[in-house]
Design a protein with these regions (language model features):
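Short, solvent-exposed loop/linker segments at the N-terminal edge
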Residues: 43-49
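Solvent-exposed loop/turn segments flanking beta-strands in beta-repeat/beta-sandwich domains
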Residues: 35-38, 50-83
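Surface-exposed, short loops/turns at beta-strand junctions within beta-sandwich domains
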Residues: 14-16, 89-94, 100-109
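Extracellular fibronectin type III
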Residues: 2-20, 117-144
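Proline/serine/threonine-rich low-complexity linkers at boundaries of modular beta-sandwich domains
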Residues: 13-33
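Intrinsic-disorder/low-complexity, polar/charged segments enriched in Ser/Thr/Lys/Arg/Asp/Glu/Gln
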Residues: 3-5, 52-54, 97-99, 109-111, ...
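Solvent-exposed serine/threonine-rich low-complexity stretches and specific carbohydrate-binding patches
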Residues: 79-93
Length: 150
């Protein structure tokens, strides 16, 4: 699994207090998790070529507006304003402040782009990270424990 993280700070009158980050320690094969946790993932039994990635979200407070998206495009690190404009759209608003799950196909380049707006309406640091997951690196589904998204 390859990970590359780059943070950007926006030039604005007032810097936001929310500096969102995403992290994970392991991923699971989605079909295997569906077999052991049908209550939450039973509809994914045919998704053998997908990873279930439990993500931890840090740097935001309840009441912040959290935006994030997963994309497969190659990021141009020189165009941070373009990525802010793309992620900070209503369709990317998520009411998740602590954790989330991502279902990602194996052996594809992904980028997670996220930003949060604090209670004063100011954007914090733009977060980006690249992911490339291998099926052979999946953790044993017997060790999977569902955590409620919040």
């Amino acid at each position: 699994t390859r990970i590359f993280v780059k943070e950007f700070t926006f030039m604005s009158d007032v810097a936001g207090s929310s500096n969102i980050t995403f992290s994970y320690t392991k991923h699971f094969n989605l079909a295997e998790v569906a077999a052991v946790d049908a209550e939450h993932w039973g509809n994914y039994t045919a998704y053998d070529n997908f990873a279930l990635v439990p993500m931890t979200i840090n740097g935001v407070q309840e009441g912040d507006i959290v935006y994030y998206m997963v994309d497969t495009r190659v990021i141009d690190w020189q165009k941070e304003s373009q990525w802010l404009a793309e992620v900070a759209q209503e369709k990317n608003i998520k009411n998740q402040y602590h954790n989330c799950y991502m279902q990602l196909e194996y052996e594809k380049d992904y980028i997670i782009v996220a930003v949060a707006k604090d209670k004063n309406g100011n954007f914090g640091t733009l977060f980006t990270t690249e992911l490339y997951l291998y099926k052979s690196d999946a953790a044993d589904a017997a060790n999977y424990n569902y955590v409620e998204v919040k």
